[in-house]
Amino acid sequence: MRYTILSKGDSKSNALKHKMINHMKDFHMVEDAVNPEIVISVGGDGTLLQAFHQYSHMLSQVAFVGVHTGHLGFYADWLPHEVEKLIIEINNSEFQVIEYPLLEIIVRYNDNGYETRYLALNEATMKTENGSTLVVDVGIRGKQFERFRGDGLCISTPSGSTAYNKALGGALIHPSLEAMQIAEIASINNRVFRTVGSPLVLPKHHTCLITPVNHDTILTTIDHVSLKHKNVNGIQFRVANEKVRFARFRPFPFWKRVHDSFIESEDGR
């Protein structure tokens, strides 16, 4: 089994990473950061997001596992005291692969049809560069839906629906549903300006094209990465053809993750 381990970088996570590497040597596992079969993140959800983006070019070949050393690990199945058990499972078991939908983002520019493509595990957001009101036309399946005015828009995956989207009042969507969700960030609604005012859930075969109105520069976030785009013609969102693969060695249902993360964990916290 070829593996690689990405650490959050703090002393606790680094120590755990080195401990795991030493244990894996006992099982003759091969550390391979270029062509791994399994990618283990040690830290929190942010560390797993970094691991996802580092290996997003080979998603069909790798499976991810999270060991969380922080306060909240929605994507992390394993705790520090369980790493020896995890290593034994990796060595001895044919692990189950769980696939989650991803978000495809295509930024189109006014420069000769140039465009860039991104993938998000959690969400993407759109805002203005200087914090002024974002004014955009929102199109769904090639038809004008609304003109949005507000602080911004958040477009999330089902697994990402528990992150920024939840804070915006969006719905929690089970990752077995191939969909994306559009949530408003502080929209302007009055007698003059009007938006739908509710999150929208779009199925896989629907695309959403968001076109800036009188904005030269758009600030986006793709998960944890902030990007500035100039001369934007439009940004298209849809459910990606690719999926992220998680290695499961024991059951950890989505709704149990939600319960443990937001209501009460098993240790009563």
Swiss-Prot record:
GO terms for biological process: NAD metabolic process; NADP biosynthetic process. GO terms for cellular component: cytoplasm. Keywords: ATP-binding, Cytoplasm, Kinase, NAD, NADP, Nucleotide-binding, Transferase. Its cofactor is a divalent metal cation. Its main location: cytoplasm. GO terms for molecular function: ATP binding; metal ion binding; NAD binding; NAD+ kinase activity. NAD(+) binds at D45, G46, N122, E123, R149, D151, A186. It is found in: Cytoplasm. It catalyses: NAD(+) + ATP = ADP + NADP(+) + H(+). The active site is at D45. Its EC number is 2.7.1.23. It is an enzyme of class 2 (transferase). SUPFAM superfamilies: NAD kinase/diacylglycerol kinase-like. Belongs to the NAD kinase family. HAMAP family: NAD_kinase. This is NAD kinase.
